[in-house]
Amino acid sequence: MGLELIRVAAQRNEVAVLVYEPRRPRNVTIVAGHGYSSSKHNLDFLCAFLQSHGCRVYNFDFPGHKLGASGGTLRGFDDCIDAMTAVVASARKAGDAPLYTLGHSMGAITALFVAAADPTIAGAVAIATGYGRPSALSVLRAAGAVDFRSAYVDGVDLPALLESIDAGFDRWIPRLEGRPVLYVAADRDAMVSPASVRELYDRAPEPKHYALIESDHTYAGEHARGEVLQWLNHLHPRA
């Protein structure tokens, strides 16, 4: 199995991407995006696991994230969309395998929106994101109960980034109709409740699948590996 760091030129920023090449490819490609204030390292365990099961994975850093290697500034959600869209285009140059977008938290929203905008994307995986997040973040901020880790990001803070995200869901999620999407909630998630994930799932078109895993918010990607693999195996049985 191989691991290569590449750089992809998006319209707004250059994007650092780790490419996980499987030893025995199964004709499935995944483009993966991390959550706010994190980096591609947060999804490394999940990506390496999927690589070991034959998937080619592109795991990238969103711009403006100081723990990552992309640099630049995160000016708004359009920068997230631009980054993942550029990585999808780069991944397609390597072959025509069915391609899925995958993400955790902020990356999950991005994965859903990018897939919705591109009907040639086979489907998506959304881990630990849900409907109604702006209201939940406002409550957490007012209570002083959470640090949104804005110091780890050059650019917009999380509440500002997500302030109109529900309108985005209303616009884009219906466009996923006919393509499979996996929605994963974590039972100990203090940032995105399972009820919020379930509401997003209930609003989404078919085909879709909902899974509840044992995890907190931060490590939901790692702990979702079994559910993600099972979902992929159902769609693409190994010979």
Feature locations, PLM:
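Conserved alpha/beta-hydrolase
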Residues: C47-A69
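Short alpha-helix in the alpha/beta-hydrolase fold that links the catalytic acid
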Residues: S193-Y201
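The serine-hydrolase catalytic nucleophile loop
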Residues: Y36-A48
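N-terminal cap/lid segment of alpha/beta-hydrolase-fold proteins
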Residues: M1-R24
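Short beta-strand/loop motif that positions the catalytic acidic residue
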Residues: L176-E177, Y183-A185
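Catalytic nucleophile-loop/oxyanion-hole region of alpha/beta-hydrolase
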Residues: S37, H65-D96
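Catalytic histidine-centered segment of alpha/beta-hydrolase-like enzymes
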Residues: S215-G226
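Hydrolase active-site cap/lid region
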Residues: F113-A160
